[in-house]
């Protein structure tokens, strides 16, 4: 009987723990429990693109999956909610009075334009729209290789309703006036509606711009409705244009990376082993057991930049070798030894255009 009571107690405790835990937000986002804020943001961004209902219209569960994803991010991206979730699960977060609902996507302005467009979000056709604002965002090659988030603090001009009324939606209409028997005159008049009065105020705004893995110069992140306001329409868009700063060791061409390495004449003749530290810190080993001439190139597959379209695909790393010759003068005996070793015929100097 005692064993039965213990078993029932264990079962009841398991059920209580299951109820308290609710959804596994770490599993939904596909991140470890010790994931940092940047890893959580990157995971959400990636899955939000894949699971967005607009891209999965044939999936009846699309809305539910996206709501779960939004709930997971809403909780795990907030330090206090995440700490509560880690201790008491989803039920503990609910008792805080917020988070975990997932009834909508609260992060559209956080991420800008999910689908890389740039048009269209100015409201109904014919609605006037404020000017777009384009800002150059200077980033490092490391940030493009690994992915990064940049916090932008700005003051945004917005129109707020105030007391009084104003003329709005003004347009020109043609009117006809009878001047006498059989005589008419047409003229143009300005006609306006009456709208609530507005005033222009400055609001503090914080945006987080994602530097996407594999993004190239000129790639844009678009935040719809964050541009210049329009007194009778919708605000324009805010566009961040990626500008990659020059790197001291690597040069990017498409998805390929290029770097130059200087080796000694001794290594050029005998072969060598060396290591190159990549943009994320991992080590690329380079080995040669043959003669390496100045300008020789070695290509390492899948060690270039990740593709923007598919981060699992990478270009090549192209290593160009420069050979440093010794600056000390050789003795006659050393020169004779080199001639003996190389057994190389004398090449007559020949001038040519090598460009």
Swiss-Prot record:
Highest taxon, organism lineage: Eukaryota
Coiled coil: none
GO molecular function (one): misfolded protein binding
Disulfide pattern: none
J domain ranges (all copies): 24-89
GO BP of this protein: protein folding; protein maturation
Signal peptide: 1-21
SUPFAM superfamilies listed in its UniProt record: Chaperone J-domain, HSP40/DnaJ peptide-binding domain
GO cellular component: endoplasmic reticulum
Entry protein name: DnaJ homolog dnj-20
Gene name for this UniProt entry: dnj-20
């Amino acid at each position: 009987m005692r064993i039965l009571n213990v078993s029932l107690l264990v079962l009841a405790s398991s059920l209580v723990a299951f109820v308290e835990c609710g959804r596994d937000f770490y599993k939904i986002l596909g991140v470890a429990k010790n994931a940092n804020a940047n890893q959580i943001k990157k995971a959400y961004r990636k899955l939000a693109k894949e699971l967005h209902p607009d891209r999965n219209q044939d999936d009846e569960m699309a809305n539910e999956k996206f709501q779960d994803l939004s709930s997971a991010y809403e909780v795990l991206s907030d330090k206090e909610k995440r700490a509560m979730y880690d201790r008491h699960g989803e039920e503990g977060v609910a008792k805080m009075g917020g988070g975990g609902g997932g009834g909508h996507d609260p992060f559209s302005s956080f991420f800008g334009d999910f689908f890389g467009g740039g048009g269209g979000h100015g409201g109904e056709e014919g609605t006037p729209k404020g000017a777009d604002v384009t800002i150059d965002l200077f980033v490092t090659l490391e940030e493009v290789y690994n992915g990064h988030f940049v916090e932008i603090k700005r003051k945004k001009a917005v129109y707020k309703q105030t007391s009084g009324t104003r003329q709005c939606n003004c347009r020109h209409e043609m009117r006809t006036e009878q001047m006498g028997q059989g005589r008419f005159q047409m003229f143009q008049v300005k006609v306006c509606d009456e709208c609530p009065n507005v005033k222009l105020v400055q609001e503090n705004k914080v945006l987080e711009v994602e530097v996407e893995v594999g993004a190239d110069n000129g790639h844009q992140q678009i935040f719809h409705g964050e541009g210049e306001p329009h007194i009778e329409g919708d605000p324009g868009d805010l566009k961040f244009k990626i500008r990659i700063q020059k790197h001291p060791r690597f040069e990017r061409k498409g998805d390929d990376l290029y770097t130059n390495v200087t080796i000694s004449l001794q290594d050029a003749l005998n072969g060598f082993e060396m290591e190159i530290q990549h943009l994320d810190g991992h080590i690329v080993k380079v080995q040669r057991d043959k003669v390496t001439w100045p300008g020789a190139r070695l290509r390492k597959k899948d060690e270039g930049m990740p593709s923007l379209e598919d981060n699992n695909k990478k270009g090549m790393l192209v290593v160009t070798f420069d050979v440093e010759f010794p600056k000390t003068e050789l003795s006659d005996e050393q020169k004779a030894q080199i001639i003996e070793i190389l057994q190389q015929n004398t090449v007559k100097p020949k001038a040519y255009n090598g460009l």
